[in-house]
């Protein structure tokens, strides 16, 4: 078989060499490095490796997003001879392919003409040891499934560890989204796939250091608006309630609430802007399926981490919760109760230690 591997790069000098030398397969393969405008040593490093490894091609773009780089690679697959690619992968430039594991995916793909996707497990680097990502724990054995049979696939909104039939090169990433550009394309591919082969082995390891997309006010606002946009779009694509619950759980719990925790730990003072954004998100949840516990977890994040409440901001928060059927007391009672809840929480945490 013929495999095309797309790697979008931009200022990845710390990891790109490790990734490129980790890629090896008995199959005929080519690597397309699509650079979005690196200003560090990424491009010279790729050019040096081109002289050492015969499989690498480099395409340079200017001021291009990750989504644009990936779409350029997909366009290349579509425009070349159909016999040049039977399948493709997209690998994050901060990842590596674990030794001998790429051919686990290619072997599964060749095994059955109905296989349109092969999905392996992803790993993260824990003090020098590769550990299975919790979202991939449902892949317990090698088996053939569909999205309807295995809705847990919707918790894996990453290209890493996935091999696609070349026919899916017609799909596109959303270039208007900076962080969740791949959600819709992955869902479409899973929905269109005749069969999906799961491989219960760790295939790709992620060396990425989480830089957080929500470190300042502007980034946080932009990120939350993006999450709301993609959440609504994908929820409208999913037909089955179980699928919508699993996807919304991933977005609400991991993308939104984890980002909210990080942001509020950095900026604990409660502001009108923060409460308004959380309000907008909570209200958007009401128009689709969601796990109720996630709603309460979001509320706890705001109330436990938030500081410097004033009467006006609290009233906006209180009215928001009343709209979704959750009562809150008057301002003074809230402050007293919150102090007691925080004290009880700290005491419980100390006892656990």
UniProtKB/Swiss-Prot annotation:
Gene3D superfamilies: Spore Coat Polysaccharide Biosynthesis Protein SpsA, Chain A. One of its GO terms (biological process) is cell wall organization. Coiled coil: none annotated. One of its GO terms (molecular function) is glycosyltransferase activity. Pfam families: Glycos_transf_2. It is an enzyme of class 2 (transferase). Its EC number is 2.4.-.-. Keywords: Cell shape, Cell wall biogenesis/degradation, Glycosyltransferase, Teichoic acid biosynthesis, Transferase. It comes from the Bacteria. The keyword Manganese does not apply. Belongs to the glycosyltransferase 2 family. This is Putative glycosyltransferase TagX. It comes from Staphylococcus aureus (strain N315). The lineage of its organism: Bacteria, Bacillati, Bacillota, Bacilli, Bacillales.
């Amino acid at each position: 078989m013929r495999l095309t591997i797309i790697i979008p790069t931009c200022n990845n000098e710390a990891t790109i060499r490790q990734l490129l030398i980790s890629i090896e397969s008995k199959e005929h393969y080519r690597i397309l490095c699509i650079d979005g405008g690196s200003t560090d040593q990424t491009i010279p490093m790729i050019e040096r490796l081109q002289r050492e490894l015969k499989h690498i091609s480099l395409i340079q773009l200017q001021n291009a997003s990750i989504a644009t780089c990936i779409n350029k690679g997909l366009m290349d697959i579509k425009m070349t001879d159909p016999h040049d690619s039977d399948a493709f992968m997209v690998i994050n430039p901060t990842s590596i392919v674990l030794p001998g594991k790429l051919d686990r995916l290619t072997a599964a793909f060749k095994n059955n003409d109905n296989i349109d996707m092969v999905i392996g497990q992803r790993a993260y680097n824990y003090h020098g040891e590769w550990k299975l990502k919790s979202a991939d724990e449902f892949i317990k054995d090698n088996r053939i499934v569909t999205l309807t049979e295995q809705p847990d696939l919707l918790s894996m909104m990453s290209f890493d560890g996935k091999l696609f039939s070349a026919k899916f090169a017609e799909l596109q990433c959303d270039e208007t989204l900076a962080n969740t550009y791949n959600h819709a394309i992955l869902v479409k591919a899973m929905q269109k796939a005749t069969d999906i082969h799961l491989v219960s082995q760790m295939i790709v390891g992620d060396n990425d250091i989480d830089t957080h997309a929500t470190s300042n006010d502007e980034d946080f606002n932009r990120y939350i608006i993006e999450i709301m946009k993609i959440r609504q779009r994908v929820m409208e694509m999913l037909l089955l309630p179980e699928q919508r619950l699993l996807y919304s759980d991933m977005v609400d719990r991991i993308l939104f609430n984890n980002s909210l925790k990080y942001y509020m730990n950095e900026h604990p003072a409660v502001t009108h802007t923060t409460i308004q954004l959380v309000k907008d998100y909570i209200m958007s949840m009401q128009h689709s399926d969601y796990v109720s516990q996630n709603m309460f977890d979001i509320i706890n994040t705001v109330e436990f981490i938030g500081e410097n409440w004033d009467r006006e901001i609290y009233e906006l928060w209180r009215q928001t919760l009343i709209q979704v059927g959750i009562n809150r007391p008057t301002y003074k009672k809230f402050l007293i109760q919150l102090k007691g809840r925080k004290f009880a929480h700290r005491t419980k945490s100390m006892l656990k230690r």
